[in-house]
C-alpha cells in the first residue's frame, strides 16, 4: 500500500501553535526565577529590565482648596476656655448640693459646697492649664518683632513679668498645698511630668534636624547629613534632650513640611521616613496634651476630695473620658490640618504597597528580585527575603518587608481616612451626650451636658465642613485639573 505522509502529532501541534511565553510577557520572568520545564530545569531566556516592560506613569495629585485653620493663639485661647468650663463642671459634679431643700444647713442655700473646695488646688490647676496659652502669647509677641529699642525692651520686660507672675502663683499654691495635704496626695500633682520624661526624652529622633527641603539635593549628601545628625543626637546628654523636648513642647507653631514629588526611590523613602517621624511626634504631642488636660481637669480634683464627701463616681469617670476624647479631637484637628493630611497622602501615593503572597501561587508568572533603585509598576511580582510580594500601588518603592511602610500606606493612601475617623469619634460623642441629656434627671447632669455640647458643636462643625469640601475636591477628575492648567 502506498505510504501516506503522516501529519504532525497532537503534541507537536499544540506546542507549535502556542507563541513563546517570552513574547507574551516580554521576557520579564527573570532575575533567577525564569521558566521551568517538566524536568524542573530552568529555561534560559534573556530578561530585560522591569522598566522595559511597563513604565509607571507619573503620580497625579488632586488640588485642594485652602481651608481656614485657627491660629495658634486663638486655638490655645479656645482650648483654655474649654478646659476651664469642664473643670467648673467637674467641681459641680463633686460639690453639688440640694439647694432647693429647706435651709437646715448653711451650705444648702447655695448650689455648691464652697467651703469644701480647695481654692489653692483650683489655682494650681488653672496655672497648669494656661501654660500653653501663656507660651503662645509670648511666641506671638516675639514674632511681631520690635520696631525700636524701646519696644524691644518693653517686650522683654512684659515676658519677664508674665513668666514671673505665673511662676510666683505656681509656687504660692504649691506651698499652701504642702501645708494642708499629705505627701501621698501631693504626688498626684507631678505624675504627668513623670510620664513626660520617658515619653519625650528617651525616644528622641532627628525630626527637628531633618527638613524636607533637603530632599532636592543628591542622595549622597542626604545620607551624610543623616549620619552626622545621628551622631550628634547620640552624643547629647540627658539634660540637653530634656531642654530640647521642653522647648518643642511649648513651641505651638510647628511648621508644616512640603512635598517635592521626588523621582528617586531613595529620596521617596527618605521623605516618608521624615514625614513618619514628624507624624509620630505630632501624635505623641496630641496624646500627651490630651491626657495632661484630662488628668488635671477631671482626675486631680477627685484625688483631693475628703473621705466624708460623697460624689457620683460613675458620672465623674464618664466626664473624665469625655474630656479626654474631646481634647484629643481638638488637638488632632489643630495639629493635623487638611494640608498636612494631603501631604501625607501624596507621599503615600509615591511610596506604594506590597502584598505578601503564599508559596505555590503564581509559580509560572514572571518574578523579579526586588531592587531598591527600581520603581515597580502595579501587579509586578518580586522576591524579597525569601518571600513573594505583589505590587499594589501604581508606584511602588517601599521595602516589602518593612511593616512601617505598609502602615504608612494604609493610613494615608486614602486622603480622608483620618478626617473620617475624627468625625466618627466626635459624632459618636455628640450623639451619646444628646442621649444622656434627654435621659438626665439631675440638674448637674443636664448643666454639664449642655455646656460640653456647645463646645463639641463647634468642633463637629469644622470637621463636617472640611469633609464636605475635601470630599468634593478629591472626587473631582484629575483630567479636569490638567485641562484647567493647560
From Swiss-Prot:
Kindly list the residue ranges recorded as spanning the membrane: 72-92, 110-130, 155-175, 182-202, 285-305, 317-337, 418-438, 444-464
Q: Which Pfam families match?
A: Tmp39
Q: Where in the cell is it found?
A: Endoplasmic reticulum membrane
Kindly provide the name given to this protein in its UniProt entry.
Transmembrane protein 39A
User: Does Glycoprotein count among this protein's keywords?
Assistant: yes
Which key words are in the record? Autophagy, Endoplasmic reticulum, Glycoprotein, Membrane, Transmembrane, Transmembrane helix
GO BP: any one term: autophagy
Establish whether keyword Membrane is in the entry.
yes
Q: Which PANTHER family match?
A: FI21814P1, TRANSMEMBRANE PROTEIN 39A
Amino acid at each position: 500500500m502506498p505510504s501516506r505522509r503522516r501529519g504532525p502529532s497532537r503534541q507537536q501541534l499544540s506546542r507549535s501553535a502556542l507563541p513563546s511565553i517570552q513574547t507574551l510577557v516580554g521576557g520579564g520572568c527573570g532575575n533567577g526565577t525564569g521558566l521551568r520545564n517538566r524536568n524542573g530545569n530552568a529555561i534560559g531566556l534573556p530578561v530585560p529590565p522591569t522598566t522595559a516592560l511597563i513604565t509607571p506613569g507619573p503620580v497625579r495629585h488632586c488640588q485642594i482648596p485652602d481651608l481656614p485653620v485657627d491660629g495658634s493663639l486663638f486655638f490655645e485661647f479656645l482650648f483654655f476656655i474649654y478646659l476651664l468650663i469642664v473643670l467648673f463642671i467637674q467641681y459641680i459634679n463633686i460639690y453639688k448640693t440640694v439647694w432647693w431643700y429647706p435651709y437646715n444647713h448653711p451650705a444648702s442655700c447655695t448650689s455648691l459646697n464652697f467651703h469644701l473646695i480647695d481654692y489653692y488646688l483650683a489655682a494650681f490647676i488653672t496655672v497648669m492649664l494656661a501654660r500653653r496659652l501663656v507660651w503662645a502669647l509670648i511666641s506671638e509677641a516675639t514674632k511681631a518683632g520690635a520696631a525700636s529699642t524701646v519696644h524691644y525692651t518693653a517686650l522683654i520686660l512684659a515676658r519677664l513679668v508674665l513668666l514671673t507672675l505665673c511662676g510666683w502663683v505656681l509656687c504660692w499654691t504649691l506651698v499652701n498645698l504642702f501645708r494642708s495635704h499629705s505627701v501621698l496626695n501631693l504626688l498626684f500633682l507631678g505624675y504627668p511630668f513623670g510620664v513626660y520624661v520617658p515619653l519625650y526624652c528617651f525616644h528622641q529622633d532627628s525630626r527637628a534636624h531633618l527638613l524636607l527641603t533637603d530632599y532636592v539635593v543628591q542622595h549622597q549628601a542626604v545620607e551624610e547629613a543623616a549620619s552626622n545628625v545621628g551622631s550628634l543626637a547620640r552624643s547629647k546628654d540627658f539634660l540637653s534632650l530634656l531642654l530640647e523636648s521642653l522647648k518643642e513642647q511649648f513651641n505651638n507653631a510647628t511648621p508644616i513640611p512640603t512635598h517635592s514629588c521626588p523621582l528617586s526611590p531613595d529620596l521617596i523613602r527618605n521623605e516618608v521616613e521624615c514625614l513618619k517621624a514628624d507624624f509620630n511626634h505630632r501624635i505623641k504631642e496630641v496624646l500627651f496634651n490630651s491626657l495632661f488636660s484630662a488628668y488635671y481637669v477631671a482626675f486631680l480634683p477627685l484625688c483631693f476630695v475628703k473621705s466624708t464627701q460623697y460624689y457620683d463616681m460613675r458620672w465623674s469617670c464618664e466626664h473624665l473620658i469625655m474630656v479626654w476624647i474631646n481634647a484629643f479631637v481638638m488637638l488632632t484637628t489643630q495639629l493635623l490640618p487638611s494640608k498636612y493630611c494631603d501631604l501625607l497622602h501624596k507621599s503615600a501615593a509615591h511610596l506604594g504597597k506590597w502584598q505578601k503572597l503564599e508559596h505555590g501561587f503564581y509559580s509560572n508568572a514572571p518574578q523579579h528580585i526586588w531592587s531598591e533603585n527600581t520603581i515597580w509598576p502595579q501587579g509586578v511580582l518580586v522576591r524579597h527575603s525569601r518571600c513573594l510580594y505583589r505590587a499594589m500601588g501604581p508606584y511602588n518603592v517601599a521595602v516589602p518587608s518593612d511593616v512601617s511602610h505598609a502602615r504608612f500606606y494604609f493610613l494615608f493612601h486614602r486622603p480622608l481616612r483620618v478626617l473620617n475617623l475624627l468625625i466618627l469619634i466626635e459624632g459618636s460623642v455628640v450623639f451619646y451626650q444628646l442621649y444622656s441629656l434627654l435621659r438626665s434627671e439631675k440638674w448637674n447632669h443636664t448643666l454639664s451636658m449642655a455646656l460640653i455640647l456647645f463646645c463639641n458643636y463647634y468642633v463637629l462643625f469644622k470637621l463636617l465642613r472640611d469633609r464636605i469640601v475635601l470630599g468634593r475636591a478629591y472626587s473631582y477628575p484629575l483630567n479636569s485639573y490638567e485641562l484647567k492648567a493647560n
